[in-house]
Amino acid sequence: MSYKLDVKAQYIKDLSFENPNSPQIFVMMSKATPEINISVNVSSISLPVKADDQKSGTENLSSLYEVTLQVNAEARIQNTVAFICEIKYCGVFSIKSDTENNEIDLSHQEVKDMLLVAAPSILFPFVRELIARATSSSGFPPLMLDIVDFRTMYENQLKQGVGQNDNDNSVDNV
């Protein structure tokens, strides 16, 4: 059986950029390179879908999920905060069956894999661009995040026992 992860919507849920020590920080930056700490968190929630909400016709049955990719970046120069950037970027996804009987028969683990690995991989390029634009617009060099391997991040969290609770569809990497 084949399944498809379909993007229904994507949006900024929360975006914050703080530049608390300007303009002095720009003088400090000319003399020292900032230390940047980045954390990435992925979470998902199931969205209720009523039978009436399903389109009539031949569309396969689907489940809707909101996946949140949260990235926090903090830059410091000599223990002075240069900037703090926090973003929660979300996508609404459906999981559809490509079969004629429209039946979704995925294990809980397979659904988590789609939501916590495949979905954030789709969202990440948009988050990366938004952070680069925000830092650049604030007078700093654009912060270009390294590509995140969500598969490895998820597998490492499983090995550590994080996110094992059935109600906890999250992966956190600090």
UniProtKB/Swiss-Prot annotation:
SUPFAM superfamilies given in the database record: SecB-like
Classify the main location: cytoplasm
| GO molecular function, a single term | unfolded protein binding
- Highest taxon of source: Bacteria
Name its GO BP terms in alphabetical order: protein folding; protein tetramerization; protein transport
- Establish whether keyword Protein transport is in the entry: yes
**Where located?**
Cytoplasm
Instruction: Identify the keywords attached in UniProt to this record, alphabetized.
Output: Chaperone, Cytoplasm, Protein transport, Translocation, Transport
Q: Name one GO cellular component term.
A: cytoplasm
NCBIfam families to which the protein is assigned, alphabetical: PRK05751.1-3 (NF004392), secB (TIGR00809)
What protein family does this chain belong to? Belongs to the SecB family.
Q: Which PANTHER family match?
A: PROTEIN-EXPORT PROTEIN SECB, PTHR36918
The task this protein performs is described as:
One of the proteins required for the normal export of preproteins out of the cell cytoplasm. It is a molecular chaperone that binds to a subset of precursor proteins, maintaining them in a translocation-competent state. It also specifically binds to its receptor SecA.
What interactions and quaternary structure are annotated? Homotetramer, a dimer of dimers. One homotetramer interacts with 1 SecA dimer.
Give the protein name, as stated in the record: Protein-export protein SecB
Species: Ehrlichia ruminantium (strain Gardel)
Gene name tied to this protein: secB
